[in-house]
Curated annotation (Swiss-Prot):
Organism annotation: Pseudomonas savastanoi pv. phaseolicola (strain 1448A / Race 6)
Protein residues bound to Zn(2+): 299, 304, 306, 312
Note describing how the cofactor binds: Binds 1 zinc ion per subunit.
Assembly: Monomer. Associates with 30S ribosomal subunit, binds 16S rRNA.
Cellular component aspect of the GO annotation: cytoplasm
This protein's encoding gene: rsgA
First-tier enzyme category under EC: hydrolase
Needed co-factor(s): Zn(2+)
Name by which UniProt lists this protein: Small ribosomal subunit biogenesis GTPase RsgA
CDD domains recorded: YjeQ_EngC
Upper lineage: Bacteria, Pseudomonadati, Pseudomonadota, Gammaproteobacteria, Pseudomonadales
C-alpha cells in the first residue's frame, strides 16, 4: 500500500502531539532525577553507552566491582545528546539505576540529518563503518557512495560488505561484479558473505575484531541476520522483504552495542533507507571521492563545476579512465542534492 501523504496541518498536529508527549516524559524524567540525586549515589566512574531509549540510556560499567554490569541511567539536563558508543562519567544509584553526569570526548562521530534537516549523531567513537548491501534489494552505487562520503568526512575507515552472496545468479552477477570491481580498483576493502549459509563469516569476523564497528545500509540487506550470525546469543529480529517494494522492513528499533569475544564492539543501528548529506559542503563531497584527490585544484578555472567547462581535470580523468562514469554520476547526484549555500 502506498504511503499516505500528510498535509501541512496534519504534520503540524502530529509534531504538536509528539512535542507534548516529549515534554511530559521530560517532566517525569526530571522528577525521577531529582529523587535519585537527593538520595545516595555512588562515586563517579566511567561507563559505555550500549543502548539509547528515549530519555534514558543503558550504560555498561567500565571499572570497579560492577565492571561489565549494565545499568539504566538518567541524564542530567545540561548534557548534550548521547548516542550508542559514547563514553561517559556516571554515578550508580539504587536498584540498578544510575545518573550520567558527564560525556567524555568523542574520537569520531557519525552524523546524519533528521527529517527536519537537523544534524543528529547516530554513533560515537566508531573506527570502522561497514557498508552493507545485497543482491536484493538491488544495490545502488549512489547510496554506497553517499556512505563512503560520510565515512571519509567523519574520518572512519569503510568496509564494503556484500551480504546474501548466495543470491548471486547468472542474471545479476555481471552487474554486481562490475559494481564491486569499481570499489576494489579504488582500493576499498570488499567482502562477499552469506549470513544465511555462513560463507565468508570468519573472514568478516577477523576484520571486525579489535574495532568499534557500525553496520549501515538500506533495510532488507541483512544487517540483523549478520549480527545474529556473528553473535548467536543476541536476539535481533529479522524482517522479510516487502513484497510490494522489494525493500526491507525495519527490524532493529534502537542502536545497540554488542561485544565480540575476542575484543571489539559492533553497533547495530536501525535501517537507513537514504543517507542524507545536506550537512556537508561541495569540498567535503569532493574529498569523499578519493580518486579526485590528485585532480581537484588542477582545473583551468578555479570555480569549475566539473560539468562542461573546458580544461576540467575531472572530465579529463573521465576520458582517461582515472574516474569511472558510475562514480561521476554519483558525485553529480550528491552535489545536486546539496543546499545551494553549500556550493
Amino acid at each position: 500500500m502506498a504511503k499516505r501523504q500528510l498535509n501541512r496541518r496534519q504534520n503540524w498536529r502530529i509534531e504538536k502531539i509528539q512535542g507534548e508527549r516529549a515534554a511530559r516524559a521530560a517532566k517525569r524524567e526530571s522528577a525521577t532525577l531529582e529523587t535519585l540525586e537527593g538520595g545516595d549515589l555512588g562515586p563517579e566512574q566511567t561507563g559505555l553507552v550500549i543502548a539509547h531509549f528515549g530519555v534514558q540510556v543503558e550504560v555498561e560499567a567500565q571499572e570497579g566491582e560492577a565492571s561489565g554490569q549494565v545499568f539504566r541511567c538518567h541524564l542530567r539536563a545540561n548534557l548534550p545528546a548521547l548516542v550508542t558508543g559514547d563514553r561517559v562519567v556516571w554515578r550508580a544509584g539504587n536498584q540498578g539505576i544510575g545518573v550520567i553526569v558527564a560525556q567524555l570526548p568523542r574520537t569520531t562521530e557519525l552524523r546524519r540529518p533528521d527529517s527536519r534537516g537537523q544534524l543528529k549523531p547516530v554513533a560515537a567513537n566508531v573506527d570502522l563503518i561497514v557498508i552493507v548491501f545485497a543482491p536484493m534489494p538491488e544495490p545502488h552505487a549512489n547510496l554506497i557512495d553517499r556512505y563512503l562520503v560520510a565515512a571519509e568526512h567523519a574520518g572512519i575507515r569503510p568496509l564494503l560488505l556484500l551480504n546474501k552472496a548466495d543470491l548471486i545468479d547468472e542474471q545479476n552477477a555481471p552487474a554486481l561484479n562490475a559494481l564491486l570491481a569499481v570499489y576494489r580498483t579504488l582500493g576499498y576493502p570488499v567482502l562477499e558473505v552469506s549470513a544465511h549459509h555462513g560463507d565468508g563469516m570468519q573472514t568478516l569476523q577477523s576484520q571486525l575484531d579489535g574495532h568499534i564497528s557500525v553496520f549501515v545500509g538500506q533495510s532488507g540487506v541483512g544487517k540483523s541476520s549478520l549480527v545474529n550470525s556473528l553473535l548467536p546469543e543476541t536476539d535481533t529480529r529479522v524482517g522479510p522483504l516487502s513484497e510490494v517494494s522489494g525493500q526491507g522492513t525495519h527490524t532493529t528499533t534502537t542502536a545497540r552495542l554488542f561485544h565480540f569475544p575476542r575484543g571489539g564492539d559492533l553497533i547495530d543501528s536501525p535501517g537507513i533507507r537514504e543517507f542524507g548529506l545536506g550537512h556537508v559542503s561541495r569540498a567535503d563531497v569532493e574529498a569523499g571521492f578519493i580518486e579526485f584527490n590528485d585532480l581537484i585544484g588542477t582545473c583551468r578555472f578555479r570555480d569549475c563545476k566539473h560539468d562542461r567547462e573546458p580544461g576540467c581535470a575531472l572530465l579529463k580523468g573521465l576520458e582517461d579512465g582515472r574516474v569511472q562514469q558510475q562514480r561521476m554520476n554519483s558525485y553529480r547526484s550528491i552535489i545536486a542534492s546539496l543546499p545551494q549555500d553549500s556550493y
